[in-house]
Amino acid sequence: MAEVHLRETDVIYVLEGTATFVTGGTVVDGRPTAPGEIRGTAIRDGETYRLSKGDVVIVPERLPHWFTEVSSPFLYFVVKPISQGGDSR
């Protein structure tokens, strides 16, 4: 599921497996699912990266992102620092 976090950064560390990771572009059929969270079915016009064991990705708040073409198993660890102030658009 494609998503955008309005106040969270994702720091992703891949532990095992491979996946295609898409960032940027526009979330297709995006809808709010929780405060500060938008999810959709895909991303249109994003940039594509191939991730594998040992890769680290930092996804800033407000940047659409999506895992696709995911191997099994695909294991990753994510830390989500949350923005505490400023604009809450």
Predicted regions and their residues:
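N-terminal secretory signal peptides
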Residues: 1-4
